[in-house]
């Protein structure tokens, strides 16, 4: 099985987004500041890294929307063992 290992979501108001996800879901939000592009890390589970990581839990982050960035929508990262075989499977099964 190839698990989802990370997610990212854009925001237009970082303080509001961080407060929302913290209040609604209890996520720990860590603002990385200007030096890191105002990225906000989202910790969704108490344990980080694979040992002791709750099954199905992943961490991710939020990034500011910018007019010159092409991909400004939520995205997921899936861990695979063999990227070439996975690309072939995607193409064979109608993916792009």
Please annotate each region the language model reported.
Residues 46-49, 68-69, 83-84:
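Short, charged/polar surface micro-motifs in flexible loops or helix N-caps
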Residues 12-15, 75-96:
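Vicinal oxygen chelate
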Residues 2-6, 71-75:
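Short, solvent-exposed beta-strand edge segments and adjacent coil->beta transition regions
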Residues 23-25, 66-70:
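A solvent-exposed interaction/effector surface
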Residues 31, 65-66:
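Basic, gly/Ser/Thr/Pro-rich low-complexity segments located predominantly at protein N termini
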Residues 8-57, 92:
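Core segments of cupin and vicinal oxygen chelate
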Residues 1, 54-56, 68-70:
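A generic structural micro-feature
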């Amino acid at each position: 099985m190839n698990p989802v290992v990370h997610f990212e979501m854009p925001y237009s108001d970082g303080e509001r987004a961080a407060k929302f996800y913290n209040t609604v879901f209890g996520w720990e939000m860590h603002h990385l500041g200007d030096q890191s592009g105002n990225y906000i890390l989202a910790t969704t589970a108490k344990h980080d890294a694979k040992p002791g990581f709750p099954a199905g839990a992943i961490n991710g982050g939020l990034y500011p929307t910018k007019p010159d960035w092409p991909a400004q929508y939520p995205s997921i990262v899936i861990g695979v063992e063999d990227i070439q075989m996975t690309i072939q499977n995607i193409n064979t099964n109608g993916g792009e």
